[in-house]
Amino acid sequence: ANAPLRAADGPTPPGDPQKWPGTGPAWDGEHFQNRRNPFWSERQKDQGAVVWFGDSITEGWRTLDRDFPQLKTANRGISGDCSRGLLFRLKEDVLDLKPTGLVLLIGINDLASGAQPTDVAHNIRRIVDGFRAARPGVPIIVCHIMPWKAQPGEHTQRIKQTNALIDALMLGRPKVKICDTFGAFALPDGTAPKDLFPDLLHPNDAGRVVWRNTLAPVMYELGMLKDGAHL
């Protein structure tokens, strides 16, 4: 039986985001707390879920239960969040659920705010380390930062650099796999396809089908899905 969760009125207030773990930009806001309050009330219901953890790209995936009927899922995406925000809320929003898997996508808001690729990649490493320490042997999927904008430029190189650093930091870790959600979407010049990213940042429903189909074989390889071909 699950031990009762810590009695409290709600999630830990964010305080000064500059004091959060990690390096690089950090912020909270009204939406941050408005999302975290329901997360708190859903803690018992979501025990043992596979948790999707990230920013608005994750928050917008509102059909996880339908798209992954084999799994109990929990969406812990917050629009506008950065990697330091995920470090701050890792315990209460994810680890307290005793999750059976993690699907992590974060970093575009960091890069858009001037973060260095090394900051983002090392914050992601800290998220993975924190999850692994609390949940030994539980599978982790780290998604590549997706393409952004219609014109290639410095931002394209920073995304590619960050993804390469993530690959290097995750290499050889047991039960940790990369999901190439950059390569699955990017046009040859590294930009976002407008048919799947109408605002050139967030995937639409058709884009989420591609994301699901890119995740599925990785989840199958990790034993999270029993059949990688038929969700």
Model-derived regions, located:
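N-terminal secretory targeting modules
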Residues: 1-53, 58-68, 133, 172, ...
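Solvent-exposed, acidic/flexible segments
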Residues: 50, 79, 83, 87, ...
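Oxyanion-hole/transition-state-stabilizing segment in secreted/luminal serine hydrolases
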Residues: 53, 58-74, 83-125, 130, ...
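Short, glycine/acidic-enriched loop or turn micro-motifs at the edges of active sites
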Residues: 58, 80, 183
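Sec-exported extracytoplasmic/periplasmic mature domains
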Residues: 91, 95, 107, 129-136, ...
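Charged, glycine-enriched surface loops/patches
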Residues: 121-143, 161-176
